[in-house]
Curated annotation (Swiss-Prot):
Localization (cell): Periplasm
Signal peptide start-end: 1-16
Pfam family, one: HlyD_D23
GO CC annotation terms, alphabetical: periplasmic space
Listed name of the protein: UPF0194 membrane protein Ent638_1286
Keyword Secreted assigned: no
Main subcellular localisation: periplasm
NCBIfam families, A to Z: PRK03598.1 (NF002939)
Family the entry assigns: Belongs to the UPF0194 family.
Top-level taxon: Bacteria
Organism encoding this protein: Enterobacter sp. (strain 638)
Residue ranges the record marks as coiled coil: 107-208
Length: 331
């Protein structure tokens, strides 16, 4: 009876030891996961939104650049002239719109009334003259050509009278709503052109959008530039990201926010610290830059690791050894 019991106990002990060993192995695998990556290369091509002659550049390759720093200047003269012209156009349009809103002065109405009286008198005279010419033509005293001349004079006087009457009516009732709306639209168009001219002048200066190091100075002062052509290339130094790749079996270990240890060849005993900031939702074939041979034919997921204690020793493109810690700051 004792022998079967001993056998059963031995089997239980072996199973427990096996399970414990497997769990220990898995924990060591998790703690020992190592990836290889590089400090992400992040550059910004800077250009002027408008074209023109490059007047000056204030930086050279290798210079440290601060956000908001003046980097370059185009010749401002053409844009200053355009701004002056736009301001003048706004003044003209504003004056015209104000006139439309104000209507006509009493003096203008009085002048229009006088013009109507004068045109009416001229029309009455031409009508009476035409009537007399008709009687003379019937008695064969004048020719048909004389009668036609009298009719033309009468019709011209009638048209002049109607024009004067229409003008007087307009002066008395004010400008039509359509004319006022047109004047307002002209003013708004001029104001928009002024705003564009101000923006164009502002954009003749090139301002650093971020801290960084100047990598490339593509042109020199005196060059004629088209809008959008690259002038300077800036290497963005903050924040520092490390790009690495992980295979699917280990993907569960790469959770956003997980703390990571980062080693460089120059300081193998003093790691940088980082956190996983992004895990790609889609797999891709391993890029050629990955140094681990057994991953080069696999589908992997890209990781972005944010370095939390970066310094100037971390240069873009530098190879990095990525080691996952156990969550307590230990490798």
């Amino acid at each position: 009876m004792k022998k079967p019991v001993v056998v059963i106990l031995a089997v239980v002990v072996l199973l427990a030891a096996g399970i414990g060993g497997w769990l220990w192995y898995q924990s060591q695998q998790d703690r020992g996961l190592t990836l290889y990556g590089n400090v992400d290369i992040r550059t910004l091509n800077m250009s002027f939104r408008v074209g023109g002659r490059l007047e000056s550049l204030a930086v050279d390759e290798g210079d440290t650049v601060k956000s908001g720093q003046l980097l370059g200047q185009l010749d401002k003269a053409p844009y200053e002239n355009a701004l002056m012209q736009a301001k003048a156009s706004v003044s003209v349009a504003q004056a015209q719109y104000d006139l439309m809103l104000a209507g006509y002065r009493d003096e203008e109405v009085a002048q229009a009334e006088a013009a109507v009286k004068q045109a009416k008198a001229a029309y009455d005279y031409s009508q009476n003259f035409y009537n007399r010419q008709q009687g003379l033509w019937k008695s064969r005293t004048i020719s048909a050509n004389d009668l036609e001349n009298a009719r033309s004079s009468r019709d011209q006087a009638q048209a002049t009278l109607k024009s004067a009457q229409d003008k007087l009516s307009q002066y008395r009732t004010g400008n039509r709503p359509q004319d006022i709306a047109q004047a307002k639209a002209n003013l708004e168009q001029a104001q928009a052109q002024l705003a564009q001219a101000e923006l164009d002048l502002h954009d003749t200066t090139l301002i650093a959008p971020s801290n960084g190091t100047l990598m490339t100075r593509a042109v020199e002062p005196g060059s004629m530039l088209s809008a959008g052509s690259t002038v300077l290339t800036l290497s963005l130094t903050r924040p520092v990201w490390v790009r690495a790749y992980i295979d699917e079996p280990n993907l569960s270990q790469a959770q956003p926010g997980r703390e990571i240890l980062l080693y460089t060849d120059g300081r193998p005993d003093k790691p940088y610290h980082g956190k996983i900031g992004f895990v790609s939702p889609t797999a891709e074939f391993t890029p050629k830059t990955v140094e681990t041979p057994d991953l080069r034919t696999d589908l992997v997921y890209r990781l972005r690791i944010i370095v939390t204690d970066a310094d100037d020793a971390l240069r873009q493109g530098m190879p990095i050894t990525v080691k996952f810690n156990d969550g307590e700051g230990h490798e």
